[in-house]
Amino acid sequence: MSKFIEPSVEEIKLEKVYQDMGLSDQEYEKVCDILGRQPNFTETGIFSVMWSEHCSYKHSKPFLKQFPTSGDHVLMGPGEGAGVVDIGDNQAVVFKVESHNHPSAIEPYQGAATGVGGIIRDIVSIGARPINLLNSLRFGELDNKQNQRLLKGVVKGIGGYGNCIGIPTTAGEIEFDERYDGNPLVNAMCVGVINHDMIQKGTAKGVGNSVIYVGLKTGRDGIHGATFASEELTEESESKRPSVQIGDPFVGKKLMEATLEAITFDELVGIQDMGAAGLTSSSSEMAAKGGSGLHLRLEQVPTREPGISPYEMMLSETQERMLLVVEKGTEQKFLDLFDKHELDSAVIGEVTDTNRFVLTYDDEVYADIPVEPLADEAPVYILEGEEKDYNTSKNDYTHIDVKDTFFKLLKHPTIASKHYLYDQYDQQVGANTIIKPGLQASVVRVEGTNKAIASTIDGEARYVYNNPYEGGKMVVAEAYRNLIAVGATPLAMTDCLNYGSPEKKEIYQQLIDSTKGMAEACDILKTPVVSGNVSLYNETKGTSIFPTPVVGMVGLIENVNYLNDFEPQVGDKLYLIGDTKDDFGGSQLEKLIYGKVNHEFESLDLSSEVEKGESIKTAIREGLLSHVQTVGKGGLLITLAKLSAHYGLGLKSSIDITNAQLFSETQGRYVVSVKSGKTLNIDNAIEIGLLTDSDNFKVTTPYTEISENVSDIKQIWEGAIAQCLTTQD
């Protein structure tokens, strides 16, 4: 008789306990068919987390298959802890983005901190040393105190974990809209570097080889975290605070160093982070990838307190844990290593040839499940979508007050400088950061070389909402442009798809169309998808977030020398590359004036993106340009103001466009500064101005002139977010 009091198999069926765990009636019946019997409590819990949306991608898997996943540089694509891309000289870059949205909505500090910790371990599990962190964040408007609390907690959590573990946070983006009220998006990305011969895989193979647990002792925190992340947020979600994991960056640092030492041991067979679904997902996935079975003896698992049941052990998401498979007879070598790093560790099982996932506690069987159906045969749902009616009418922007509009946009938190927040992150630890947060992309030197990795993270929402297909293309192209802007060659990308409930026809259609657009852009821009994450059911009280695909992209800079003087100077001429059109659908201007975004916008020419990108990259590397800035949120006037304010330079510009077009967000445009004495020869590049040593920012069109002090613009732009957070307290 079991020493743990749990519902019987009959009670699980009759009282539909499985529904509380996240399984539908049909899914429960499929589990019964797989087992040839009714599952017990532990088995039901295991299937519920492995078949959750968060772990199985059961609503999104068909769309993910559209993405190109191979390329000249790709060494390892989706299916492992992170993607791996060649950067030459027997080196590779390892990277991935993950969401921690639901936990951050309930417990913002720990939700964000453990999101950072988890993505770091994904990179480390491949064998790479992390070199930088990035994040993409979304919150409701800051006139709401709950949103302020969430923002403060998330930023502190990101900084608290990253700073303690010693990895710089070098890039990110933050936007604000009421559609994220109560449902923030917290997407964390990590980048690492590794030698080819050190690349690890999460596989369990070799009959008789041992399974080793290392890291924090297992507690009851985070139980059913994967299931929680697959549900809509409701008023009852606050009661699921125990589903939010607790991070310990100091143990995380020890675990990282110990793991990076363990991968140098030839006797290591496979390794995987215990992330979502904890010991369940890590062990069963390793067995599936190895074509093996596993027998875990759960009484050997290090636990934080007595009485933790097999069900709780398997579903706990206690942080800072890794699972290793090592050659039989070499266990002590690894245990001694972990003891040296003051980490708890234990041999908890072995690899078998049964292709079954067997769990025992004091010789009593608590689970006996075939590996492949558990890990690879979750049901896949293809639902019915419904096209949104696009508004093809045109709003009137002919009578806007340019100065008033300019300052309102400049101080909106989405456009305002994020330095008040980024200053809470350690941006320089490791001393290899070349370009810090706040510009187009971060650049981190590969230690001991003259190479650097450029990385960026970008999300799109309003445009995806207005036209999912075109918006999907745009988010990939935006990341591509940001890497071009620092002279990098884009290599590959990772994605995080943040959407509402796929069971709603319009949202399901958004998934269909936006991923189609993303896949097309990936193909044309030659940026294959090597890793990723899906976060669905981002809804609060029945209201969905904007569909928000996020793209993390990395690029290679073969020689960083050209960045030594890559900074705009007095006397540099300014050029605009790309046409400016009446493009206001989905823009900050449309939202400001009309209070909503629901109009169409120009389609994106991806072939033109490649042509412009290659020309600009060449000009940067030939030493012609001192700065490149993409024209983004708020349009050209805002872009020029941010350039002037960031560098404290005067600016004088004359542009032949309308007043409204100053705020147009036509895609595919760059503002570049050409070094004094140099000549720019790029098609469709128009000279628009000059950088000066004055305190004057002056932009004229045939219809208006705006002339302001740079110092005033800088004060408003840099102080807006701090003012929002202090005046509302």
Swiss-Prot record:
This is Phosphoribosylformylglycinamidine synthase subunit PurL. Coiled coil: none annotated. Pathway: Purine metabolism; IMP biosynthesis via de novo pathway; 5-amino-1-(5-phospho-D-ribosyl)imidazole from N(2)-formyl-N(1)-(5-phospho-D-ribosyl)glycinamide: step 1/2. Keywords: ATP-binding, Cytoplasm, Ligase, Magnesium, Metal-binding, Nucleotide-binding, Purine biosynthesis. The active site is at H54, H100 (proton acceptor). It comes from Staphylococcus aureus (strain NCTC 8325 / PS 47). It catalyses: N(2)-formyl-N(1)-(5-phospho-beta-D-ribosyl)glycinamide + L-glutamine + ATP + H2O = 2-formamido-N(1)-(5-O-phospho-beta-D-ribosyl)acetamidine + L-glutamate + ADP + phosphate + H(+). Transmembrane segments: none annotated. It comes from the Bacteria. It is found in: Cytoplasm. Mg(2+) 2 binds at D122, D273. It is an enzyme of class 6 (ligase). Its EC number is 6.3.5.3. Monomer. Part of the FGAM synthase complex composed of 1 PurL, 1 PurQ and 2 PurS subunits. Part of the phosphoribosylformylglycinamidine synthase complex involved in the purines biosynthetic pathway. Catalyzes the ATP-dependent conversion of formylglycinamide ribonucleotide (FGAR) and glutamine to yield formylglycinamidine ribonucleotide (FGAM) and glutamate. The FGAM synthase complex is composed of three subunits. PurQ produces an ammonia molecule by converting glutamine to glutamate. PurL transfers the ammonia molecule to FGAR to form FGAM in an ATP-dependent manner.
